[in-house]
């Protein structure tokens, strides 16, 4: 996948806007060139896939199922070119259909990455769960836009992009809480996590694990610092395992 033409990243207050276009060398290159090195690091490898047709998703899932990856994460915030470019992740029907298609070709645990650009995240989550998802991850980016006031053109060549970083964190916490209360499968929380306090908050909302992305632009060691802070918090609180945090929020 070639990705989008530049400019494709713009800084925003408390975050970034990007329209990179999921540029990558492809699943075959990943399996042959990148995966062997990743497995040498003695870490769990989760392969993220994205496509423009159900067939593309299924083909990638099938190939990765025969590889040594530990899990497949399916990004459904992509346009379905067979249905007018509408994103796969914006309706229960399309989420259920793409999950069912990939599940039929996937031998690995399957995690579905949900879009926040929906009216009811809980019903979307249930649709993915009902069609065989083993876990859910959320949130993906919120759609946003910036305009150069001198040229009067959008700053990003794609016109719009995905907003990530601390600006979306409260939205992510809310959606993780709603999703965790609607499904029985594990929920992985993401969206603006940059400190260990954010990680604790996300897990209290219902996340069993977290992902860190945008914070790495400013601090490549952010995940290590988050882990260290999280361990200190557990010790201070007398909590034996991080799993005990998941969903422990006390709503009013």
Spell out what each predicted region is.
Residues 39-40, 66, 104-107, 134, ...:
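Generic secondary-structure signature for well-ordered alpha-helical cores
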Residues 193-195, 217-218:
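Short Gly/Pro-enriched loop/turn and capping motifs at secondary-structure junctions
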Residues 28-35, 96, 100, 173-180, ...:
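Predominant activation on well-ordered alpha-helical scaffold segments within soluble catalytic domains
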Residues 243-252:
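A short, charged, Gly/Pro-tolerant segment at domain boundaries
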Residues 52-188, 194-212:
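Alpha/beta enzyme core
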Residues 3-13, 147-161, 203, 215-240:
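C-terminal helical cap(s) of enzyme catalytic domains, especially alpha/beta-barrels
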Residues 1-43:
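Glycine-rich, positively charged N-terminal anion/phosphate-binding segment
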């Amino acid at each position: 996948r070639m990705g989008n033409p530049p400019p494709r990243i713009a800084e925003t207050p408390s975050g970034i806007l990007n329209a990179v276009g999921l540029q990558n060398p492809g699943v075959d290159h990943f399996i042959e060139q990148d995966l062997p090195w990743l497995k040498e690091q003695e870490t769990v490898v989760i392969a993220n896939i994205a496509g423009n047709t159900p067939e593309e998703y299924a083909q990638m899932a099938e190939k990765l199922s025969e590889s040594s990856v530990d899990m497949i994460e399916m990004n459904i915030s992509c346009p379905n070119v067979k249905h007018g470019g509408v994103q796969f992740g914006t309706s229960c029907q399309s989420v259920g259909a793409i999950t069912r298609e990939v599940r039929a070709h996937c031998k690995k645990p399957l995690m579905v990455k949900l879009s926040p650009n929906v009216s009811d995240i809980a019903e979307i989550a249930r649709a993915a769960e009902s069609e065989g998802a083993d876990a859910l991850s959320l949130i993906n980016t919120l759609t946003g836009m910036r305009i150069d006031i001198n040229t009067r053109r959008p700053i990003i060549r794609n016109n719009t992009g995905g907003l990530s970083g601390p600006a979306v964190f409260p939205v992510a916490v809310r959606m993780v809480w709603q999703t965790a209360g609607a499904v029985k499968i594990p929920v992985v929380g993401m969206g603006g996590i940059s400190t260990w306090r954010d990680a604790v908050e996300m897990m209290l909302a219902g996340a069993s694990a977290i992902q860190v992305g945008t914070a790495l632009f400013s601090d490549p060691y952010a995940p290590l610092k988050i882990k260290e802070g999280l361990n200190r918090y557990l010790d201070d609180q007398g909590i034996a395992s991080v799993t005990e945090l998941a969903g422990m929020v006390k709503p009013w």
